Regions:
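Conserved active-site alpha-helix within GNAT-family acetyltransferase domains
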Residues: 137-148, 269-270, 281-302, 313
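A conserved beta-strand-loop-helix scaffold within acyl/acetyltransferase catalytic domains
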Residues: 201-247
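Acyl-donor-binding surface of acyltransferase catalytic domains
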Residues: 42-177, 302-319
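Conserved acetyl-CoA-binding loop-helix of GNAT-fold acetyltransferases
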Residues: 99-120, 250-267, 288
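Short amphipathic alpha-helix that is part of the acyltransferase structural core
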Residues: 2-38, 164-203
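A structural microfeature
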Residues: 73, 227-229, 299-300
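Conserved hydrophobic beta-strand within the GNAT/NAT acetyltransferase core sheet
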Residues: 239, 274-280
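Conserved glycine-rich acetyl-CoA-binding loop
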Residues: 241-256, 284
Length: 321
């Protein structure tokens, strides 16, 4: 498809078979597609979301292997946030002229599409912004002009291979669990979890993360269940909210809770193809932690961008049409 004819073609993501094929199609591009896969899976496995939308720059619904172009982009929209993934994200090479034009066109089309969809959401406000998450460093310069507020500082994405590989087995069996009680988070823990987070999260949201969490407890505490370290898998598939009580640091509880969370997820559901997390430069301890955590690798830079879809969506729509 010529760049001037490029379009975001809808994917019937509400169809179970098509949704499964969509995830399977993206898996060979892991870990670069992890943000998009995680967000899509969460909205497919939880209560069905009629507002989940997906597109590709080729006709995914009627594709064959020979028809998938080398350069393509897939995109996802949910009421909370969106994702973009370009096949060229996997390349260490600089952005080519062809790729630059492709990405620029995709971003413009996505802003227009998101603008239209946001206006259909319950509780829509005229001045709404829309969060585009885990924006790859190759996409960021093209997304930035559409931002409302200043984008977040860059986040480094860290990823870990699948639980059934040899490298992760070393991590999972690393710290000794015998001294500690390992559980998931519980309702009574949520206020503490919220109060220790750098990000504002509701109790309602944290409650949905209980099944995807791990919590290390001190059996020698007064009630025998004091939570001293925890981690959860977020809605987009990332591992986050990692916290270790200051009184218990230096005991490798961070590494323990990461490995236990991955194990619990593998026991309770289909194991993730990749585990991943992000860290900003303003949390150097977090970055240092993952840099030294066996089995984990530092990846590329990403950003979280709040698109001013009302302002820029109308402008872009006029420019395209």
């Amino acid at each position: 498809m010529a760049t001037e004819d490029l379009a975001l073609l809808p994917i019937d993501i509400q169809d179970t078979e098509t949704a499964g094929a969509f995830i399977s199609f993206l898996e060979p591009f892991l870990p670069f597609s992890c943000g998009l896969i995680g967000l899509t899976q969460s909205h497919l496995t939880s209560q069905p979301d009629p507002y989940l939308k997906a597109w590709a720059t080729f006709d995914f619904n009627y594709r064959s292997t020979s028809e998938v172009p080398k350069l393509f982009t897939v995109a996802v929209f949910t009421p909370i946030q969106g994702r973009l993934f370009c096949s060229a994200d996997t390349s260490p090479e600089d952005v080519t002229a062809e790729e630059l034009i492709h990405r620029e066109r995709v971003v413009r089309l996505y802003v227009v599409t998101a603008t239209s969809l946001i206006q259909t959401l319950p509780g829509h406000e005229e001045d709404s912004e829309y969060l585009l998450g885990v924006v790859h460093e190759k996409f960021f310069p093209l997304v930035k002009p559409y931002a409302g507020d200043a984008p977040t500082p860059p986040y480094r994405l860290f990823f870990c291979p699948p639980p059934d590989t040899e490298v992760i087995k070393t991590t999972v069996t690393g710290p000794d669990t015998s001294r500690w009680l390992v559980t998931g988070l519980e309702e009574s823990d949520l206020e503490l979890v919220r109060s220790t987070s750098h990000f504002q999260r509701t109790i309602e949201y944290l409650r949905t993360r209980i099944p995807t969490s791990a919590c290390i407890r001190d059996p020698d505490s007064a009630d025998g269940r004091r939570p001293v370290a925890w981690l959860m898998k977020h809605l987009d598939g990332s591992m986050g909210a990692l916290y270790v009580d200051p009184d218990y640091r230096g005991k490798r509880l961070g590494a323990l809770v990461v490995s236990e969370c991955i194990k619990r997820l593998g026991e309770n559901s289909v194991p993730d193809k990749f585990s991943w997390s992000t860290s900003t430069k303003f949390h150097p301890r977090f970055s240092e932690f993952f840099n030294h955590l066996e089995g984990w690798e530092a990846g590329w830079r990403t950003w979280w961008v709040r698109l001013d879809v009302v302002k820029h969506g109308r402008v872009v729509h006029r420019a395209i049409n």
